[in-house]
């Protein structure tokens, strides 16, 4: 499974990061790195919950960060 994290800076200075392949994985951070870290953690949590609920089968995961 190939996932990507996209980020952008909001007008108020906060950073927004999301994983488009996982609806609902959208987080804010004070810095870009903070937002990216939070998005990665949330994405892994969502995938783990899906596996626990039998909604998928284990497969290698690759997460890339869009520039």
Per-region residue spans from a language model:
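A short, exposed loop/beta-hairpin motif centered on an aromatic-Gly-Thr core
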Residues: 23-33
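Short aromatic-glycine-(Arg/Gly/Cys) micro-motifs in beta-strand/loop hairpins
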Residues: 8-22
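Short, charged, surface-exposed hinge/linker loops at domain edges
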Residues: 1-4, 33, 37-67
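Intrinsically disordered, low-complexity segments enriched in proline/serine/threonine
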Residues: 22-25, 60-62
């Amino acid at each position: 499974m190939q996932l990507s994290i996209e980020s952008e800076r909001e007008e108020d200075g906060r950073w927004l990061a999301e994983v488009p392949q996982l609806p609902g994985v959208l987080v804010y951070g004070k810095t870009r790195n903070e937002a990216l870290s939070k998005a990665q953690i949330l994405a892994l949590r969502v995938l783990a919950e899906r596996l626990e609920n039998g909604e998928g089968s284990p497969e290698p995961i690759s997460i890339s960060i869009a520039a």
